[in-house]
Amino acid sequence: MRQNNSKVIGVAGGVGSGKSTVLDILRRKHDAVICMADELGHEVMRPGTAGFDKIREAFGEAILSPEGEIDRELLARRVYRDPDQLRRLNAIVHPLVISEIRKRISERDCNRLFILETALLFETGCDQLCDEVWGVVTEDEIRIRRLKDSRGYSREKAESIMRNQHSNAALRTLCQRVLVNDGEPRDLEAQINVAVENLLENPK
């Protein structure tokens, strides 16, 4: 395989846009390595890590489960009611996650695509670690319908979440490539195949 298969691609998109489908296609059809920041966030909170110690020091023993682990649901309820507490948590977790992302990128298999998915790709500067960022855009009404069907969200809840994320227009500006996910899965897959081919044929 070609050396330039080691490209790093960031995938951005709002809730209900179909990012998970994009990641699945890249994994199945292009043997890509998927790095999800949310999973890394869990890892840096495990007992015995620096993240665990810092979070326990910042938020106290009350956020620990009976097993001595961080109760992520309890911690989430606590910080999302208080913007200052949320900023405090992010100040601990984000640098640790970014450090782990950098480590995994530096150690990646040079014969495989490396895909980075994080909700705060641009806000944390992780887009600068990528060769390209691909935005997944979907009409808002389609996203709302998907969220109702798959997660049981009300329209109000879906719209509230969407308002706090990058709009389709913003993604079209921020991203080097845009994948439109308004149609059938095969249409999305075809776009991904073309995007991968173009990226690998145009090394930087």
Feature locations, PLM:
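ATP-dependent NMP and nucleoside kinases share a basic, alpha-helical "lid"
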Residues: 99-108, 113-150
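ATP-binding Walker
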Residues: 17
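Walker A/P-loop
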Residues: 20
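Hydrophobic anchor at the beta1->P-loop junction of P-loop NTPases
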Residues: 11
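Small-molecule kinase domains that catalyze NTP-dependent phosphoryl transfer to phosphate-bearing small molecules
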Residues: 97, 101, 128-129, 149, ...
